[in-house]
Amino acid sequence: MKPLDLNFICQTLDLPMPSENQPVSRIVTDSRDIQDGDVFFALAGERFDAHDFVEDVLAAGATAVIVSREDCAALKGALKVDDTLAALQKLAKAWR
């Protein structure tokens, strides 16, 4: 399997290319499980909205966070999409 990188994610999700491509270790949706090199998708659930934890995720070493809320979009490392769940599904389909 080819390695995953930030350029592939941005290209797949129709986002602007980053100034510097970076390898991605994992795709993560649990903010408690972040490691250096992860990309975090901030999903909104019935009880929690992961956007509330985006700053913590970035501080824990995430390479990038995929967000849909405007208040998170300005953070360094944030990539804004319309719908984070749809973006995660699109990335998964492209990666198969």
Predicted segment positions?
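N-terminal leader/targeting and accessory segments in enzymes
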Residues: 1-90
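Walker A (P-loop) phosphate-binding motif
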Residues: 92-96
